Amino acid sequence: MSVVFVAASKLPTPFGVFTMHGFLDEATGKEHVALTLGTVDDGAPVLGRLHSECLTGDALFSLRCDCGFQLEAALRAIAAEGRGVLLYLRQEGRGIGLLNKIRAYKLQDAGADTVEANERLGFRADQRDYGICKPMLEHLGITAIKLMTNNPRKVKALEGAGIQVTERVPLQTGLNPHNQKYLATKAGKLGHLLGSLHQGEVETPTGS
């Protein structure tokens, strides 16, 4: 794997002062980031999340997905724990890129679900590659993680890379009328573990 560490700096946020570690995937040219809080290289399991880039949800407050809500909830949880890691992976639109994501949204506006839209554009339902996580975690000295995710594929990917997942921590937040079908599709077609959140129980999003 051609992922190399480039530089690190402090990153003050509303949730605490994190350390931001920058990585470059030399094979793709993509730049990835890890945020850490506290001591994470002591061998004890670290609360963490693998978060794929979502410009619309993370930065533009979109209600079409739950990404922005999950990002905030994960950072809040790490801050409450006092230590943890968040890998921010530049895999926009489940790996299809921003412009193709907008094309997929247009198909969804016409009635397709999130999986059907990707497939009509010639992509797999999920194109993300979590192999980039191993060298990032190795650089940070993390060998065991309590993973905040609803996606069993992330657990399997980390375990397959030799990272011990000691616990899966559900991260269910952000359900609203605009993303109800999207979440139901993630549960029904992508195997995400969303409990009652895809059974028609719509909550008012709070962001945490």
UniProtKB/Swiss-Prot annotation:
Any Pfam family hit: GTP_cyclohydro2
Keyword check for Metal-binding: yes
Coiled coil spans: none
Entries under CDD domains matching the protein: GTP_cyclohydro2 (cd00641)
Known cofactor(s): Zn(2+)
Pathway listed: Cofactor biosynthesis; riboflavin biosynthesis; 5-amino-6-(D-ribitylamino)uracil from GTP: step 1/4
Keywords: GTP-binding, Hydrolase, Metal-binding, Nucleotide-binding, Riboflavin biosynthesis, Zinc
Active site: D126 (proton acceptor), R128 (nucleophile)
One GO BP: riboflavin biosynthetic process
MF-aspect GO terms: GTP binding; GTP cyclohydrolase II activity; zinc ion binding
Residues given in the record as GTP binding sites: R49, L50, H51, S52, E53, Q70, E92, G93, R94, T114, T149, K154
Reaction(s) this enzyme catalyzes, per UniProt: GTP + 4 H2O = 2,5-diamino-6-hydroxy-4-(5-phosphoribosylamino)-pyrimidine + formate + 2 phosphate + 3 H(+)
One GO CC term on file: cytosol
Primary enzyme class: hydrolase
Cofactor stoichiometry and binding remark: Binds 1 zinc ion per subunit.
UniProt EC number: 3.5.4.25
Binding site for Zn(2+): C54, C65, C67
NCBIfam families per record: PRK00393.1, ribA
Role: Catalyzes the conversion of GTP to 2,5-diamino-6-ribosylamino-4(3H)-pyrimidinone 5'-phosphate (DARP), formate and pyrophosphate.
Family membership: Belongs to the GTP cyclohydrolase II family.
Protein known as: GTP cyclohydrolase-2
